[in-house]
Each structure stands twice: as structure tokens, then as C-alpha cells.
């Protein structure tokens, strides 16, 4: 895959339930701390190196932001780093909340 793919929140949740995909949230630390999707990893400039060391390049990666816009750039970045299956979650965390999918709140 030379480019990321789009996935809706239901498709993202289905991949997570299969136990193979990794969900990353690229929102700011305050937003992530208030609420985030269950099992989401907070991907930041400070955590990217550890993330890339811990995750297999073949593992599907789901990238979530606020509304599904900035996740596209982050998803393409991960593809460029060598990740093979990268998805931008359409609608982002807002769509995840609207769909009433599992959320962790502080």
C-alpha cells in the first residue's frame, strides 16, 4: 500500500474487535485526557519513536483525530514510514462518539 485508506467508525471498531488493528489518536493531550476511544494509543511527536519500535509494520493502523481531516496527513506519514495497512478514521473522534462506540473518560 503506497497510500492510506479511509474507514468508517464501524469498520474501525470491527477491525479492533478482531484484535489485530492498533488505534492511534493524534488529538492534543488535553482532548485525549478528557475522553478517547477505548484502547486508543496517544500518538504524539514524543511517542512516535516508541510506537514505531513496538508495532509491526504489517499490523493494521487506524488513525483518529477530531473530525477525520488531520488524521489523513498522519496516516500518509505512517505509510511513508513503511506501515503497510494504514486507515484514516472518517469523522474522527466526533463520529466515534456519535456512534456510541466504547470511550474512556477521565
Curated annotation (Swiss-Prot):
Pfam families: Rhodanese (PF00581). Its EC number is 2.8.1.1. Its main location: cytoplasm. One of its GO terms (molecular function) is thiosulfate-cyanide sulfurtransferase activity. It comes from the Bacteria. It is found in: Cytoplasm. PROSITE patterns: RHODANESE_3. Keywords: Cytoplasm, Transferase. Residues 17-105 form the Rhodanese domain. GO terms for biological process: glycerol metabolic process. GO terms for cellular component: cytoplasm. It is an enzyme of class 2 (transferase). Belongs to the GlpE family. PANTHER family: FAD-DEPENDENT OXIDOREDUCTASE, THIOSULFATE SULFURTRANSFERASE GLPE. This is Thiosulfate sulfurtransferase GlpE. The lineage of its organism: Bacteria, Pseudomonadati, Pseudomonadota, Gammaproteobacteria, Vibrionales. The gene is glpE.
Amino acid at each position: 500500500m503506497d497510500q492510506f485508506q479511509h474507514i468508517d467508525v464501524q469498520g474501525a471498531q470491527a477491525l479492533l474487535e478482531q484484535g489485530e488493528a492498533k488505534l492511534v489518536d493524534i488529538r492534543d493531550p488535553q482532548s485525549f485526557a478528557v475522553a478517547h476511544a477505548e484502547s486508543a494509543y496517544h500518538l504524539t511527536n514524543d511517542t512516535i519513536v516508541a510506537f514505531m519500535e513496538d508495532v509491526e509494520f504489517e499490523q493494521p493502523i487506524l488513525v483518529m483525530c477530531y473530525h477525520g481531516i488531520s488524521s489523513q496527513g498522519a496516516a500518509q506519514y505512517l505509510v511513508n514510514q513503511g506501515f503497510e495497512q494504514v486507515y484514516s478514521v472518517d469523522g474522527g473522534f466526533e463520529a466515534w462518539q456519535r456512534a456510541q462506540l466504547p470511550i474512556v473518560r477521565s
